[in-house]
Each structure stands twice: as C-alpha cells, then as structure tokens.
Amino acid sequence: MDLTIVGSDNTLPVSDVVFGREFSEALVHQVVVAYRNTARSGTKAQKSRSQVSGTTKKSKKQKGGGARHGALTAPIFVGGGVAFAAKPRSFSQKVNRKQYRSAICSIFSELNRQGRLKVVDAFDVEVSKTRVFAEKIKSLEVVGSSLLIVSDEISECLSLSSRNLPCVDVRSVQALDPVALVGSDVVVLTVGAVKKIEEWLV
C-alpha cells in the first residue's frame, strides 16, 4: 500500500503488515493496560496493627466494660493500624514481544484507516522558536487537540521549539509507546521514521 506525503504529490510505499493489518481491540487494550501498569511505582504502603507505634497493653478489663478489647492499635480504634494494610509491590505485567509489536502495528493501521496518520518528508526547524514551530504545524492542516510527531532524528532546535506547546509531543522512533499512539488525535511521521518503524516491526 502507499501513503500520501503531505505537501507533495509523491506517495510512499509501505508495508501492509504495519499499516494495513486488521485492528485488534482486545490486543491493543491488553498491551496498553500492561504498559500503564508496568509504569506504576507501586510504592503505596500502610501500617498494620503490628507496625503502629503504641502500647499493646489491654485497654480495659475483660469483664463488665461492654465490648471486649485488647490493644488500642487494633484497626477499630482511631490511630490504630489498617486492616489488610497495603504493601509496596510490583504491578508490572509481562507482554510477549510479538504481542507488543502486533499491537503497535494494529494501532498504526487503525490510525491510517481513520485518516489520523500523516507522512511528511522531514520535520525540522532552523531556529529554536515556538512561533516558527507552531506555523509549521499549522501548514500541515491537522485537525485535533493532541498531536504526536515521530521523527527519525530530533535536533536540538526541534526539541526546544516544541516543548512549550502543551498538546504537541515530539518523539523519536525509539521512544514510541502504545499509550502515546492511542492518546493522540493525529500522528505525523517523517519518511525516515516510517522506514525505521518498518525495520523494527516487520
């Protein structure tokens, strides 16, 4: 299949495996959830009754005082421990390499079908000015609230001029992830990035 290059009459032949495969919602959902869970720090911690600082002396005598109680560190008391206290743990989920790559291909294919995938010859700016970068984006005539630009090489000028725009994300091919692709309204790829993506996924 061929992708039209924005601002040119030329087309770019691309692999059907990457940009023309059937969309698998279940696979994409599985990979996105696993990716987000793996990014969790998992440092939540609470103190159980054995970890709370306080005396373990019986608070009152056994008989004649109503409900029977022991230590004041029990979860029922204010200042006591937490029942079933949370402990630090890993939320990471294993995803097979084939699954991950298939999900990325599936996302690219669906973006292409929906007209949310654009290809440009190159995307670079000569000066580190946000205004110049914004004008370049405007010339692409993309419609959407969030824009992801994937380039084979990111110059210092491109990085500096784009970082002040809240709804624009500039990444290299190596920094691509399924969450960034799914969360973007429009994805712009350079020709060099397309070739690197095909080398990675095919």
Swiss-Prot record:
Give a GO molecular function annotation for the protein: rRNA binding
Which spans does this entry mark as compositional bias, Polar residues?
A: 42-52
Q: Name one GO cellular component term.
A: ribosome
SUPFAM superfamilies per the UniProt record, alphabetical: Ribosomal protein L4 (SSF52166)
The record's annotation in Gene3D superfamilies points to: 3.40.1370.10
Keyword set includes RNA-binding: yes
Give me the ranges of the annotated region Disordered.
Answer: 42-70
Instruction: Give the keywords, sorted.
Output: Ribonucleoprotein, Ribosomal protein, RNA-binding, rRNA-binding
GO biological process entries: translation
Task: Report TM segments.
Answer: none
Domain of life, per lineage = Bacteria
The entry assigns this protein to a family as follows: Belongs to the universal ribosomal protein uL4 family.
Job of this protein: One of the primary rRNA binding proteins, this protein initially binds near the 5'-end of the 23S rRNA. It is important during the early stages of 50S assembly. It makes multiple contacts with different domains of the 23S rRNA in the assembled 50S subunit and ribosome.
> What subunit structure does UniProt give?
Part of the 50S ribosomal subunit.
Q: What is this protein called?
A: Large ribosomal subunit protein uL4
Species name = Xylella fastidiosa (strain Temecula1 / ATCC 700964)
